[in-house]
UniProtKB/Swiss-Prot annotation:
InterPro entries: L-PG_synthase/AglD. It is a multi-pass membrane protein. The lineage of its organism: Archaea, Methanobacteriati, Methanobacteriota, Methanomada group, Methanobacteria. It comes from Methanothermus fervidus (strain ATCC 43054 / DSM 2088 / JCM 10308 / V24 S). Belongs to the UPF0104 family. This is UPF0104 membrane protein Mfer_0536. Disulfide bonds: none annotated. Its main location: membrane.
């Protein structure tokens, strides 16, 4: 049922995007795409691949800090499949759990420890997101003169993301809060396991063990110097490379645009992709990118051409790479991804 919903949402998203492109003018868009410089497009693809590799390096720092043993190659495949799964699920919600599951399976470690590494890896993105959001929102107010309500909406979304991460992190390192979480889960469990004291006792023991393993893994990573002094700066490098990739696509079309505007579009696209409507923000993100670039002075058909090519690299290439890893994980994994 879930995979049918995702397929329907993808079809709706692509249909809306198609209508948008028809309105702009397909012939003009195709003509602009034909003029793109292959050298700069190759550079954009190379930067994207480098970004994925550095993402794996950053995650590996958390994995090593949690004392989980695995090699680079399977870790890269797991990362790419997780990112591809995010691109086909609303609010990018499926990839993290899949990454934790696969890491747990192939490293033969508890799922709780694997999930903790994914939490830290995602959390490291919060810091460049905050910095770029502050710069971008001020620039949006001054240059684009967006309505106050739109800016407030973006600020609320950003605050919700940051607040949620730090709350989860705080709960993750405080043993007493872990006990409260366990009590809350047990209260719900007692509704479904009335008059089954043995099952409740086993469940309580498993939950306690899971929370302890998870919190131990988080504390190990936070105390590790490499997480702070290597992985955190690497997060800023990864975001910088994202901007360079988009910039390279603009160069391919002979267009110069301020990197601040690119950063703004990235931030808005990131926040929009977190809204649980369309898979990976498909359709909505493309529309916003075309709108922003045209407002920055890029002709509408050219904005559409640049957006299509950029999304082919950042969105669809990632999905293709993720699908290409499925044979490595076995036929059973195909069902798990598309459930």
């Amino acid at each position: 049922m879930k995979h049918k919903k995702s397929i329907i949402l993808i079809i709706i998203s692509i249909s809306l995007l198609g209508l948008m492109l028809i309105f702009i003018g397909p012939e003009k868009i195709v003509n602009d795409i034909r003029k793109a410089d292959p050298l700069y497009l190759s550079l954009a693809v190379a930067v994207h691949m480098l970004t994925l590799y550095l993402w794996m390096v950053r995650w590996r720092i958390a994995v090593v800090a949690a004392k989980i043993k695995t090699k680079n190659q399977p870790l890269f495949r797991i990362l790419v499949l997780g990112l591809a799964t995010n691109n086909i699920t609303p609010a990018k919600s499926g990839g993290e759990a899949l990454r934790a599951y696969l890491l747990s399976k192939y490293s033969k470690t508890p799922f709780e420890s694997s999930f903790a590494t994914v939490l830290i890896d995602k959390g490291l993105d919060t810091f460049p997101l905050i910095l770029l959001s502050i710069i971008s929102l001020f620039h949006m107010i001054l240059v684009f003169r967006f309505s106050l309500w739109l800016v407030i909406g973006l600020l609320i979304t950003l605050f919700a993301v940051v607040f949620s991460f730090f709350i989860i992190l705080y709960v993750s390192v405080k043993p007493e809060l872990g006990k409260k979480v366990k009590r809350g889960i047990m209260r719900i469990a007692r509704i479904f396991y009335k008059h089954k004291s043995k099952k409740l006792s086993k469940l309580e023991s498993r939950i306690s063990d899971a929370i302890v393993k998870y919190q131990d893994a988080v504390r190990l990573m936070i105390k590790n110097k490499n997480v702070i002094y290597v992985a955190l700066p690497l997060s800023f490098v990864i975001w910088f490379l994202e901007i360079i990739r988009i910039w390279a696509v603009f160069w391919a079309f002979g267009v110069y645009i301020s990197p601040i505007i690119i950063a703004e579009v990235m931030i808005v696209a990131t926040l929009v992709s977190m809204v649980p409507i369309f898979p990976g923000g498909l359709g909505a993100i493309e529309g916003l990118m075309i709108l922003f670039y045209s407002m920055a002075g890029v002709p509408l058909p050219l904005s559409a051409a640049i957006t299509i090519v950029e999304r082919l690299i950042s969105f669809w290439l990632t999905i293709f790479l993720g699908v290409a890893t499925l044979p490595y994980f076995g036929s059973d994994m195909v069902g798990k991804v598309f459930k």
